[in-house]
Amino acid sequence: MSTKEKLISHVMKEEPVGSRNKVTVVGVGMVGMASAISILLKDLCDELAMVDVMEDKLKGEVMDLQHGSLFLKTKIVGDKDYSVTANSKVVVVTAGARQQEGESRLNLVQRNVNIFKFIIPNIVKYSPNCILMVVSNPVDILTYVAWKLSGFPRHRVIGSGTNLDSARFRHLIGEKLHLHPSSCHAWIVGEHGDSSVPVWSGVNVAGVSLQDLNPQMGTEGDGENWKAIHKEVVDGAYEVIKLKGYTSWAIGMSVADLVESIIKNMHKVHPVSTLVQGMHGVKDEVFLSVPCVLGNSGLTDVIHMTLKADEEKQVQKSAETLWGVQKELTL
């Protein structure tokens, strides 16, 4: 008899029960790992699967996380074979070519489309009912690409979008007002990145509209220069990349925030990337961020935001820029 047999006597043969809320992270780069640790530390799933083409890096990261199993409640698995991801509830895609210093998110496109042609069919094969969350940049275009390649209905393909931009925005407004970001309600919509649209008309603290107090807020003529805050949001990622080489922690926490709303069926409203054709005067098949309700079935509803004419124009301009790139893509 082995030590194990001497120690433990079976009462019944265990039937394998699949995980109810398995999450997969595709890509073990900086963003993938920050997403993984954020998901683990928030205890969101009972199984976390990780997959990447870089076998040694993947093996090392998985092993490193598994060594912390005592401090976690999540089973951690990893393999370059996508069978490890089977029956995931949410699949987070962070894989792709990384943005170089000074490189625009749009420049990354075709490099990442080619990577997605391998990743997406594999995800669909093993988790045909999952909710796909795209994080790789440029996120709005790649969410469209994932939607096209997966054949999933639009409510099951979500881009992390401006969830992070809005968090950065709220943090900076909070800094200026000496308040916690959760008390500074503010939304950034449109494209994640350079042409994102700050909705100044909706910025409020405790229901008090800041534009009511300062009608010039967000315009060139504003003596307090609130507009600079949005510039800081846009420049924020480039600044971090310049200083440390990549961004990871905030996007990782942002991803975990979205995964939590889905897995816990919270019906929380997040600015995430979805098909906006027919909204805010957008005519083309593009994905942009608008406030959306997230729950167990994915993206169930869109909130109709009241945008000012110039804000709406900016959204349409983003849409045109993205469509200009999308129609050139070979899918």
Swiss-Prot record:
The active site is at 192 (proton acceptor). Pathway: Fermentation; pyruvate fermentation to lactate; (S)-lactate from pyruvate: step 1/1. InterPro entries: L-lactate/malate_DH, L-lactate_DH, L-lactate_DH_AS, Lactate/malate_DH_C, Lactate/malate_DH_N, Lactate_DH/Glyco_Ohase_4_C, NAD(P)-bd_dom_sf. GO terms for molecular function: L-lactate dehydrogenase activity. Substrate binds at residues 105, 137, 168, 247. It comes from the Eukaryota. Its EC number is 1.1.1.27. Pfam families: Ldh_1_C (PF02866), Ldh_1_N (PF00056). It is an enzyme of class 1 (oxidoreductase). PANTHER family: L-2-HYDROXYCARBOXYLATE DEHYDROGENASE (NAD(P)(+)), L-LACTATE DEHYDROGENASE A CHAIN. Belongs to the LDH/MDH superfamily. LDH family. This is L-lactate dehydrogenase A chain.
